[in-house]
């Protein structure tokens, strides 16, 4: 993947000084706020279509990834799908026979519902499907119930990453959340539930990796010693 990225940049006429992997960048963004130094972190990168769990150790200016686990077919889209199917079930309709346009409406409303819940106690879905006015109201507790199967799929990579790193959760100094799905309070609460450790919440999941990459570039520009090990 790194070789392909370098080749793509070269073909585009972009000079690549160095690549920094995403977990290391997230750890740097965290350290920029909390202080540079030694530490061991769990990086939960939960985007629209993939989940990656990384255990990153920072020691003597070296960022080393101790273990990686994940699910390449799990992301925010799975929450959308679960909400969409629940909407149809509660309104007594079958999702599968719906026209592509109607399906698109239901999925769009499901995503809007998911996005709005972090900032308000309840979210409502209203759609005109097949000439009928359909509606559904969700709160965060119901969202957890509706998406329980999705949440359970999150637990396995978390446990595998810890197992492969030969560390326990007590060895983890902090849990860093990145990716749009980590903005959901229900995701943060579930990570805390399965680890027993409250994740860091003062890092922006949407921009943490970009910030970390910028910090890495700044450190390299000053010729400071920093190594990034895969």
Region locations from a protein language model:
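Oxyanion-binding/catalytic loops of NTP- or PPi-dependent enzymes
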Residues: 1-230
């Amino acid at each position: 993947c790194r070789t392909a990225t370098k080749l793509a940049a070269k073909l585009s006429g972009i000079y690549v000084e160095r690549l920094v992997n995403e977990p290391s960048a997230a750890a740097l963004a965290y350290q920029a706020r909390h202080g540079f130094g030694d530490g061991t972190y769990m990086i939960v990168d939960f985007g629209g279509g993939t989940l990656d769990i990384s255990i990153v150790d920072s020691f003597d200016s070296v960022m080393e990834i101790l273990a990686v686990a994940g699910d390449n077919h799990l992301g925010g889209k799975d929450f959308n799908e679960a909400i969409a199917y629940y909407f149809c079930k509660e309104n007594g309709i079958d999702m599968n026979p719906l026209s592509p346009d109607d399906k698109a409406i239901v999925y769009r409303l499901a995503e809007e519902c998911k996005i709005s819940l972090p900032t308000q106690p309840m979210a409502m879905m209203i759609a005109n499907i097949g000439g009928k006015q359909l509606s559904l109201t969700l709160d965060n507790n119901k969202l957890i119930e509706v998406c329980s199967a999705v949440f359970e799929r999150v637990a396995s990579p978390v446990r595998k990453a810890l197992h492969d790193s030969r560390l326990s959760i007590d060895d983890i100094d902090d849990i860093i959340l990145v990716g749009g799905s980590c903005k959901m309070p229900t995701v943060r609460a579930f990570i805390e539930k399965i680890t027993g450790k409250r994740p860091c919440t003062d890092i922006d999941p949407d921009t943490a990796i970009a910030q970390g990459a910028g910090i890495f570039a700044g450190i390299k520009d000053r010729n400071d010693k920093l190594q990034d090990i895969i």
